[in-house]
Swiss-Prot record:
Keywords: Chloroplast, Coiled coil, Phosphoprotein, Plastid, Transit peptide. Residues 24-38, 329-339 have a biased composition (Low complexity). It is found in: Plastid, Chloroplast. GO terms for cellular component: chloroplast; microtubule associated complex. The modification Phosphoserine is found at S1279. PANTHER family: SYNAPTONEMAL COMPLEX PROTEIN-RELATED, WEB FAMILY PROTEIN. Residues 78-147, 252-1162 form a coiled coil. Belongs to the WEB family. It comes from Arabidopsis thaliana (Mouse-ear cress). Residues 1-79 form a transit peptide. Residues 59-74, 319-328, 1200-1218, 1265-1276 have a biased composition (Basic and acidic residues). This is Putative WEB family protein At1g65010, chloroplastic. Residues 1291-1304 have a biased composition (Polar residues). The keyword Transit peptide applies.
Length: 1345
């Protein structure tokens, strides 16, 4: 358009000047008369001022008419005025056209500048977008790389976990092979674990409820803690009162027992007289018949008990052993009865004489029965009071423990819920951070686009085309809003789920309270049953069955609780799935945002294309600019929509941040209750960090479930082993070995626990002293209390050491040691737990062992006292005493051997530990430090859990100690009662006729006692599997019942002592004691055999470890030797480098001398023409040769001095090389002179061969030296070889040169050759002598070194 306007404007002035000539003619015709000649000068001026185009036309009219007429002048004037007007118009038009052109050019320049600026801005925006996209891609790549690394790390952790699982599975297979009969129990445990898994999925729904009730639970816990403190104070007061009463009653009982014993001894003295009597045969036969009847009744009872035992056999395999022992005892009782029958046949002849004495004895017996009945009433009242107090205490303790367990369960569920929430919040925060980054990048793009928009505001005309794009953006906004609403609805659903979980927790608390009430009712029923148990044996059996049923009900209640927990776990898993879905939705939102970004990129590409079109077609710029403005307006609208979306997202973020703050406040409150569950929290935190990768989270959950299953299986195995240990009734020696093993394992845990190990060894020594000091039971009890106190202090020290271990994690320098310790900890975890359980059981069995030992000691005293009274059977008793003394000596020797074996075991175990440490150090150096760090953290978490368990066990041990003290008081009371019995038995001398019936009833009572003990032990073993603490309390109650039963039995013995025969009683007691001693000896021998077998196995292990140690020592020696060789090679390399430098210096000096010699040879050849100067030249050459030899000697001496610092072997090799180098130089010099003198081809070739041989020798020595040099210096030696080769080539060239030179002069100097040869022959031996002297000097210096 601009070109067209220009052409139109330029054509207008050209068309206008064409018509003036006709107009001038007309005017000249009309106005010729009126005008005068006066205005001529003006016309000239105007014509002179006119442009040349106008002046050129009138010139042809002027030339022909030089004398103008007035008409012509007038016409000219008119034409001039017209022309001037036309010219003025044309000039004005031209000015206007120029102004328009300038304006158009300015507009064009402005438009072009605007376009350029817009293009620049668009390009800058595109570049920034590209940069943002590249940054996004980098971030995505880095995110993917981090994901890949995390996946790799998780895979490595999973591999390590799988390895652990493989090892644990191997251990489980070994355990299953040993316990094939326990598969049913394991299957039941696995089913329970599956139920627990199912319930764990439900625990996530209960997390918010647990948080809401956390404060209430804490308040309730504080109230219960206060109540527990009050109850504990009351219990202490009651225990003090009971202790005082028990001590008093024990003193009285001891006095009564001593009296009864004295009376029994007197009766035994009288039984010898009664044995002569035969009158009591008939009564004894009746008693024998009664015994038979009683035996049949006992057999019926045995059948009943066997049926009950068969029912319990399916649950516990170890009870069969106890039944076998009971059967053995019964068989022994039957044997004793047979012996008694034989003795009764012998006593038939004697009993006739004892009839007269029976009447007086009956009167005495009646008096004693009255006294015994009075004592029984007193004892029954006392037992009732004690039982009532203990039952109240047990009730209170059960309440406290149940409350504590409930609180712990609630705390665990809270912690799990909080951890899951933390994981969810962390994922949300990551997504929000990504969104914030995208929003920041979008804002940057917006700022840049706004800059471009400010420049392009003048082009906002086409807004209609952007309406479609704005509608699409609005649709996307609506989609985002819907997604946000969905998120909010999900949050609301989570809140509702939390409310539901809170309600469930409230229901659980109510159930727990109902269970507490039911437990109270059960305790009341137990009291009633205890009162009814005194009626007879049938009531006792019914009571036991009721207890068993109640224990089953408790088991069922515990299983119901487990099922509830499984449901809670299922709910938690469902929550996890919901969170995964939320994360998937968030990822989809991110994908939508990425699509929008791509859409922006496409729109920017379209803008670029349109800007290129604007450049190509300037005429269509308005349309293109309209399109651009339309696109920019659409972008603005889209940006506004994006800003709105970002604002909405920021609001959502703020709401999420508020929720996070609320959650953090709740977590801070809950973290105060997490002190006891640090290990579980760490594991859950690891799971929360792993939530970034959903697939890995599932695998980790599976691994955790597997570990929980393994742990529960291990717990079942541990419980079974505890039952086996309780049935086996391990002796004190086994307890001592267990303590030693615990000490050794604690040494393996850390070398810093030496003080703890020493104190545990002191405990082991104290436990050994229990075996040596069986007679001094009171001292043993005191020492046991001290040892337990020390154990508590040691456990505290273990906690301190565990804290120090946690601080040692920060020390990176000790990573290898940490890895070694982690493996040691892995291998010893299982044994540590086993031995802790064994200690708990062993501490429970110590009281029983002590009571047995007291009974044995008392029986020994009775035997020694009976030895004085027995006159007829003194020989038999003396033999028995001698056998007992021998057995006692054997026992002492066995005990000493046991101590020696234990000491040896400790020494062997120490050696094994040292060897195992060496082996582990050498093997663990190849492992990775990262895996060891992870394993170390896991092991430390487990250590914390185990230390907590140890603390609980220490508390249980303290309770056991207190209860053992109470039992000790009861034992003292029993001893007092026995003393009273002895006094009462002195009065029973007249009751010899009733001895047979008394013996029968005693046997029956013993059988009943054995059966009672068996049933009680069975009950205790079954209750131990349910709850250890409740089992301990019940065992104490059973022991109290046993004591009461023993008191009742003593009373029965006292009542029936009038009907017993003293001699039969002595024989049965002796037999029983002998059988017990034999059993003890057999147990000791078995223990010795086991110790010997262990010693043999330990010796084998020591031998294997010694072989390993020798192999490792050999490897270490080889390693040291290799290191020494490396050091020697390094020193050799250094020396070789030094000597190479020296040789290089020698080479340079020799080359310089060779050049000098060659110059001198040339000068000498030139001077051969002068015969007068021939002698002088030879003398000069000889002197120079001597100078050269002296120089070589000096160099050899200096080299020898420097070689004194190196090894002899290197000195010889290097000196040989150094010695050869000057000799070779001398030989080369001589050969060159010979070549110059002789000038014969075959001699020259021979000399070259000699040179080559010398060079080969030097090369061989150099190769030998190179073989000794380390590979690091081979490159330097190769360079030296190249230099030697170059030297050889230069020497050959010089020889050729000298040969050529000598051949040219052969014709001229043939007469002087003979003289030259003679002089050279004189020189050669001198030079050889100098070389030999140098060799001798070098060898002498080396020999002196």
């Amino acid at each position: 358009m601009a070109s067209r306007t220009k052409t139109g404007l330029m054509e207008t002035p050209r068309s206008k000047p064409s018509p003036p000539p006709p107009r001038l003619s007309k005017l000249s015709a009309s106005k010729s008369d009126s005008n005068s000649a006066s205005p001529v000068p003006n016309t000239r001026l105007s014509l002179d001022r006119s442009p040349p185009t106008v002046n050129s036309k009138p010139t042809p009219d002027r030339r022909p008419s030089r004398i103008p007429t007035p008409e012509k002048v007038h016409s000219r004037l008119v034409k001039g005025t017209e022309l001037q007007t036309q010219l003025n118009q044309i000039q004005e038009d031209l000015k206007k056209a120029d102004e328009q052109i300038e304006l158009l050019k300015k507009d064009k320049a402005k438009a072009i500048d605007d376009l350029k600026e817009s293009e620049k801005l668009v390009e800058e925006a595109n570049e920034k977008l590209k940069e943002a996209l590249a940054a996004q891609k980098r971030a995505e790549e880095s995110f993917e790389v981090e994901k890949f690394r995390a996946v790799e790390l998780e895979q490595a952790g999973l591999e390590a976990v799988q390895k652990k699982d493989v090892t644990s599975k191997n251990e489980l297979e070994s355990i299953r092979s040993q316990h094939a009969l326990d598969i049913s129990a394991l299957l039941s445990t696995t089913e329970e674990l599956q139920r627990v898994k199912h319930e764990l999925s439900m625990t996530a729904d209960a997390k918010n409820k647990a948080l809401s009730h956390a404060e209430e639970a804490t308040k309730i816990a504080e109230i219960h803690a206060e109540k527990a403190e009050i109850l504990a104070s009351e219990l202490g007061r009651l225990k003090a009162l009971l202790g005082s009463k028990e001590e008093k009653e024990a003193i009285e009982g001891n006095e009564i027992v001593s009296k009864l014993k004295s009376e029994i001894e007197l009766l035994r003295g009288e039984l010898e007289k009664v044995s002569i009597l035969e009158s009591s045969l008939k009564e004894q036969e009746g008693l024998v018949e009664q015994l038979k009847v009683d035996l049949e009744a006992a057999k019926m009872a045995e059948s009943c008990t066997n049926s009950s035992v068969e029912e319990w056999k399916n649950k516990v395999h170890e009870l069969e052993k106890e039944v076998e022992e009971s059967n053995r005892s019964k068989s022994s009782a039957s044997e004793s009865m047979e012996s008694v029958m034989k003795q009764l046949a012998e006593l038939n002849h004697v009993l006739h004489e004892t009839k007269s004495d029976n009447a007086a004895q009956k009167e005495k017996i009646e008096l004693l029965e009255k006294t015994i009945e009075a004592q029984r009433t007193d004892l029954e009242e006392y037992g009732r009071q004690v039982c009532i107090a203990k039952e109240e205490a047990s009730k209170l303790e059960n309440l406290v423990e149940s409350i504590k367990s409930e609180l712990e369960i609630s705390q665990e569920e809270k912690t799990r819920a909080l951890d899951n929430e933390k994981a969810a919040t962390s994922n949300i925060q990551n997504l929000l951070d990504q969104r914030t980054e995208l929003s920041i990048e979008l804002e940057r793009c917006k700022v840049e686009e706004e800059k471009s928009k400010k420049d392009m505001e003048s082009l906002t005309l086409a807004l209609q085309e952007a309406s479609t794009e704005s509608s699409e953006a609005k649709a996307t906004l609506l989609v985002c809003q819907e997604e946000l609403k969905n998120c909010e609805s999900q949050v609301d659903s989570l809140k509702l789920a939390s409310k539901e979980t809170n309600e469930k927790y409230e229901k659980m608390l109510e159930d727990a309270r109902n269970e507490i009430d039911s437990l109270k009712s059960t305790v009341d029923s137990i009291q009633n049953e205890f009162e009814n148990s005194k009626a007879g044996w049938e009531q006792k059996e019914l009571h036991l069955m009721g207890c068993v049923k109640k224990s089953e009900e408790e088991n069922s209640s515990s299983q119901e609780e487990v099922s509830r927990l499984v449901n809670l776990l299922k709910e938690s898993e469902e929550d996890a799935c919901a969170r995964k879905e939320e994360e998937a939705s968030l990822k989809n939102n991110l994908k939508v945002a990425e699509g929008e970004v791509k859409y922006l990129q496409e729109t920017l590409g379209e803008a670029k294309a349109e800007s290129m079109k604007l450049k190509e077609s300037l005429l269509d710029k308005e349309e293109d600019l309209k399109n651009v403005t339309a696109e920019i307006s659409s972008l603005r609208e889209w940006e506004g929509s994006v800003l709105e979306k970002i604002e909405e997202l920021s609001k959502v973020k703020e709401s999420l941040v508020d929720k996070e703050t609320k959650l953090q406040s709740i977590t801070q409150e809950a973290e105060e209750l997490k002190g006891r569950e640090a290990a579980h929290m760490k594991q859950i935190e690891e799971l929360s960090t792993a939530n970034a990768s959903l697939v890995d989270e599932a695998t980790k959950l599976q691994s955790i479930v597997q570990e929980s299953e393994d742990l529960k299986e291990k717990e079942a195995g541990y419980l079974k082993k505890i039952e086996e240990l309780s049935v086996a009734n391990e002796s004190l020696a086994d307890n001592v070995t267990d303590l030693q093993s615990i000490v050794q394992e604690s040494k393996d845990l850390k070398e810093r626990e030496v003080a703890y190990l020493k104190k545990i060894e002191e405990l082991s020594v104290a436990n050994e002293s229990l075996v040596d000091k069986e007679t001094k039971l009171q001292h043993i009890d005191q020492e046991a209390e001290e040892l337990r106190g020390r154990e508590a202090s040691h456990l505290k020290k273990i906690e301190e050491l565990s804290k120090e271990n946690e601080n040692l994690v920060d020390n990176v320098a000790n990573m290898q040691n940490i890895a070694e310790e982690s493996k040691d900890l892995r291998e010893r975890e299982v044994a540590y737990l086993k031995k802790i359980d064994e200690l708990s059981t062993a501490n429970g069995t110590l009281a029983d062992n002590v009571t047995n030992l007291q009974n044995i000691s008392e029986e020994n005293k009775e035997l020694r006292e009976r030895e004085t009274t027995l006159l007829k059977k003194a020989e038999e008793l003396s033999e028995l005493n001698e056998s007992l003394v021998d057995k006692a000596s054997k026992l002492q020797t066995v005990v000493q051997e046991n101590e020696e074996l234990r000491e040896r075991e400790t020494a062997y175990l120490k050696k094994i530990e040292e060897l195992s440490k060496l082996h582990e150090i050498l093997s663990d150096q190849e492992t990775k430090l990262q895996i060891s760090n992870h394993e170390k953290e896991e092991l430390k978490e487990r250590e914390t859990a185990y230390l907590k368990k140890i603390e609980e066990l220490s508390k249980v041990q303290e309770d056991l100690l207190n209860k053992e003290n109470e039992l000790h008081g009861m034992v003292v009371e029993i001893e007092d009662l026995r003393s009273k019995d002895s006094l009462a038995q002195k009065k029973i001398e007249e009751l010899s006729n009733f001895n047979a019936s008394l013996l029968i009833k005693e046997n029956e009572l013993q059988a009943v006692v054995c059966e009672n003990e068996e049933l009680k032990s069975k009950q205790v073993s079954t209750l131990k599997t349910i709850d250890e603490l409740s089992d301990l309390k019940q065992s104490l109650i059973h022991k109290e019942k046993e004591l009461q039963a023993a008191i009742v039995e003593n009373e029965k013995l006292k009542a029936e002592a009038a009907l017993s025969l003293q001699r039969i009683e002595e024989l049965t007691n002796l037999k029983q004691t002998l059988i017990d001693k034999q059993n003890e000896l057999q147990g000791v021998f078995h223990e010795n055999e086991e110790l010997k077998a262990k010693e043999a196995s330990s010796l084998k292990k020591i031998d294997e470890l010694l072989h390993l140690e020798q192999s490792w020592l050999e490897k270490e020696s080889e390693f040291q030797r290799v290191t020494q060789e490396n050091l020697e090679l390094k020193t050799q390399d250094a020396l070789a480098a030094k000597k190479i430098e020296e040789l290089s210096k020698l080479k340079e000096s020799l080359l310089e001398k060779e050049t000098e010699l060659k110059c001198r040879e040339a000068a000498a050849l030139e001077k051969m023409e002068e015969p007068s100067k021939h002698g002088n030249s030879e003398l000069n050459s000889i002197g120079k040769d001597y100078d050269l030899v002296q120089f070589s000697e000096v160099n050899g001496a200096s080299n020898g001095d420097e070689k004194t610092k190196t090894d002899h072997y290197q000195q010889r090799s290097r000196e040989h090389m150094i010695q050869e180098s000057p000799m070779e130089a001398i030989d080369k010099h001589l050969m060159g002179e010979r070549a110059a003198i002789h000038k014969v081809a075959h001699r020259v070739e021979g000399e070259r061969n000699v040179e080559k041989e010398s060079e080969f020798k030097m090369w061989d020595s150099y190769k030998i030296e190179k073989s000794e040099v380390s590979p690091e210096r081979e490159t330097e030696l190769d360079s030296v070889e190249e230099e030697v080769d170059s030297k050889a080539e230069s020497s050959e060239n010089m020889d050729q040169y000298s040969n050529g030179f000598s051949l040219t002069d052969h014709t001229e100097d043939s007469g002087n050759l003979l003289l030259k040869e003679q002089h050279m022959k004189k020189k050669k031996p001198l030079l050889r002598k100098f070389g030999n002297l140098l060799k001798k000097k070098s060898t002498s210096s080396s020999s002196q070194k």
